[in-house]
Amino acid sequence: MRKGIYHLVKQIVVLFYYLMCNLCPVKQNRIVFDSSLGKSYSGNPKHIYEYLMANGYDLNWDCIWFYENEKYNIPGMSRQVRYGRLRYLYYMATAKVWVFDTRQPEFLLRRKGTYYIQTWHGTPLKKLALDMEDVFMVGESDIDSYKEHFTKNVHTWDFLISQNPFSSETFRRAFDFHKEMLEYGYPRNDILFWENTTEGIRSFKRKLGLPEDKKIILYAPTWRDDE
């Protein structure tokens, strides 16, 4: 019974999204942003948005941020819409540009006239997607099914941001991505260069209470969604 209701609701959601795509025009000045499926305000989408805001683009563009549970403290003139709700589907259907850092639900096909910028969220030092031999992720257990769904999702991307030639090569192979690779570096890393000055380093150490005369080593193991 519960499973049947779930599938019925899913069909209604999909139908609503397709109706929005067919009935509502694309808003030429609308950009939607999403980090980790609405779970955070962070990563590359955050820093792309804040660059646009710093240069005044949020005054002329309708910038929409999706959130999962609670709204975030987002600067500028953006609006926030709860992830997965009907308004979310409407803004997805009518946006000119999507800026996301992870895969979206498979039924959310990018319509004609919309551009999808996939920023991704890390350097491919571990095996990804088609390079994987096993899958241990929440909601995923069959590697063949995982690869099939991943490939379908990738084929909706128009642009993929890459950090360096190594990442570009790995992404093309592991994601089966054949469209435009934006090998510009990650927007979230720009601050590491902008503030990489003697005074910037001292200020950072003082803020964290670290000794100014010592080198600092950061241990940051990769995140796993099954842990």
Where are these regions (language model features)?
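N-terminal pre-catalytic "stem/leader" segment of glycosyltransferase-like enzymes
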Residues: M1-L86
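Conserved catalytic-core segment of nucleotide-activated headgroup transferases in glycan assembly
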Residues: S40-A54, A174, P187-E227
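Structural alpha-helical scaffold elements that stabilize or flank donor/cofactor-binding regions
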Residues: Y90-M92, L109, N153, L210
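Short, hydrophobic beta-strand segments that form beta-sheet elements in well-ordered domains
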Residues: N60-E68, V97-F100, L160-S162
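Glycosyltransferases and closely related glycan-assembly transferases
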Residues: E50-D58, A93-T94, E106-Y116
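Short N-terminal targeting/anchoring amphipathic segment
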Residues: I31-D34, Y90-T102
